[in-house]
Amino acid sequence: MIVYLDSSAVVRSYLADEAGSASPSDLIRDPDITTVTGSWTRIEATSAFVRAERTGRFVFAELEAAFLRDTDPAGGNLLVVDVSQAEVELIALRVVREHGLRAMDAWQLACAHLTFEALAEPHEQAAFVTRDAEQARIAREWGYLLI
């Protein structure tokens, strides 16, 4: 199984005080599941980690260290994918026009779509993880399992 984690799910896996933080974290640590996320997740996660430190909830350096360990290309369990900007923007624009989805949510869906096309084996289950109900609805329409 290949699982794309939207940035909301990735962030939740590091912020243990957030509801549902165990599920994405368990997915990332499961050696039998290929977990992936888009390159913008690095920016969104870092932003969330900084805000969590500013509110006194967590220490930024600890969150960042865990995230960097998980996304380390040499041995991390969360693959950060870089997709073609032109391709992802075309798909994201279509999603925004058709569904009115927020821009970054559309970008994440488009990135997941391109990632599944490139990395999923034939007949391999493709799953999507998000906290956003509208994004989840579209992912389901596209045939992705929701976790």
Q: What residue spans do the PLM features occupy?
A:
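Helix-adjacent hinge/juxtasegments
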Residues: R51-V83
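Active-site neighborhoods of divalent-metal-dependent phosphate/nucleic-acid chemistry enzymes
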Residues: G76-E134
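Aromatic- and histidine-enriched alpha-helix N-cap/loop-to-helix transition segments
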Residues: T37-I43, A103-W107
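Extended low-complexity acidic/polar segments
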Residues: I2, S7, E98, L109, ...
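Short glycine/serine- and small hydrophobic-enriched flexible loop segments
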Residues: S47-R54, H113-E117
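Alpha-helical elements of the RecA-like P-loop NTPase motor core of helicases
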Residues: R12, A22, L90, A136-R140
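A general alpha-helix detector
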Residues: V10, E44-A48, I91
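Short, well-structured N-terminal submotif of metal-dependent ribonuclease cores
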Residues: M1-T41, A52-A65, Y144-L145
